[in-house]
From Swiss-Prot:
Name listed for the protein in its UniProt record: Olfactory receptor 1G1
UniProt entry tagged with the keyword Disulfide bond: yes
Side Cytoplasmic, residues: 50-57, 121-140, 220-236, 293-313
Purpose of the protein: Odorant receptor.
Record-level GO cellular component terms: plasma membrane
Gene: OR1G1
Stretches in topological domain Extracellular: 1-25, 80-100, 159-196, 260-272
Membrane topology: Multi-pass membrane protein
GO MF term list: G protein-coupled receptor activity; olfactory receptor activity
Disulfide-bonded cysteines: C97-C189
GO biological process: signal transduction
Organism taxonomic ancestry: Eukaryota, Metazoa, Chordata, Craniata, Vertebrata
Family annotation (Pfam families): 7tm_4
């Protein structure tokens, strides 16, 4: 089959989950509900952290950035899917597809970096509490977040430019509900070896850094917690990182199922459904995990609601 240069491609077709009208209506309602809950929850977390000066600490600075990344992450994919269902279309422009790929990779990797940074923050808070303010200075916090944004922006740009260099066959149907890197590579007529090599090297290196940061940080955290003599002290120390551990488990577990499962067990429909877990469900649950498990967030939420009641007519 003759290849077609990318400059002549005008659009791709996102096959999504189903072509049945009734199923699409159910999907539209479900995803719209999850999207609105996700956006409202994450924006509320950001609002609470900004308005409550007691939460102006490194831990909540990182949490606010994670909530922003979650809101942007889901906004990269779900609105386009909802719009396509609404107008009964599967099309996405070529430039729109590459743009979606860029921002998807940016925010998914940013989330991984922020989770690793938050693990380091918990390590310092629990293992070096007397030096916490000195180590986690405002300058370091801003540097860690800024570096995460910049590195992942460049990382995503590299993969998007490499994707732009490929040529595609006549089949432009993507068996997914958004433009992910694996489905796009499978449509290429050109040899994607360079793309796959760069993914293996850069993705493996960044993934290894994040995983090592998580493992080393929490190995030291648990070692320190076990040395605390009182049961109350252990519970208080563990409560500091329990929410973060829950979010890491959700994000990493669902991502691992999609990208690192054996090829023999993978199918397009299965991957699409599994992708929903880490692209939509996990970001939606994160605000609930942090608000339900974190006493300071719950207290700040109550104060915010109380202030609004007082000032309401």
């Amino acid at each position: 089959m003759e290849g077609k240069n990318l400059t002549s491609i005008s659009e791709f077709f996102l096959l999504g989950f189903s072509e049945q009208l009734e199923e699409q209506k159910a999907l539209f309602g479900s995803f719209l509900f999850m999207y609105l809950v996700m956006v409202a929850g994450n924006l509320l977390i950001i609002l609470v952290i900004i308005t409550d000066t007691q939460l102006h600490t490194p831990m909540y600075f990182f949490l606010a950035n994670l909530s922003l990344a979650d809101a942007c992450f889901v906004s990269t994919t779900v609105p386009k899917m909802l719009a396509n269902i609404q107008i009964q279309s599967q099309a996405i422009s070529y430039s729109g597809c590459l743009l979606q790929l860029y921002f998807f990779m940016l925010f998914v990797m940013l989330e991984a970096f922020l989770l690793a940074v938050m693990a380091y923050d918990h390590y310092v808070a629990i293992c070096h509490p007397l030096h916490y303010i000195l180590i986690m200075s405002p300058g370091l916090c801003v540097f860690l977040v800024s570096a995460s944004w910049i590195m992942n922006a460049l990382y995503s740009l590299l993969h998007t430019l490499l994707m732009n260099s490929l040529s595609f066959c006549a089949n432009h149907e993507i068996p997914h509900f958004f433009c992910d890197i694996d489905p796009l590579l499978s449509l290429s007529c050109a040899d994607p070896f360079t793309n796959e090599l760069v993914i293996f090297i850069t993705g493996g290196l960044t993934g290894l850094i994040c995983v090592l940061c998580l493992i080393i940080s929490y190995t030291n955290v648990f070692s320190t917690i076990l040395k605390i003599p009182s049961a109350q002290g252990k519970r208080k120390a563990f409560s500091t990182c329990s929410s973060h551990l829950s979010v890491v488990s959700l994000f990493x577990g669902t991502s691992f199922c999609v990208y690192f499962s054996p090829p023999s067990t993978r199918x397009a429909q299965k991957d699409t459904v599994a992708s929903v877990m880490y692209t939509v469900v996990t970001p939606m649950l994160n605000p609930f995990i942090y608000s339900l498990r974190n006493q300071e967030i719950k207290s700040s939420l109550r104060k915010l609601i109380w202030v609004r009641k007082i000032h309401s007519p």
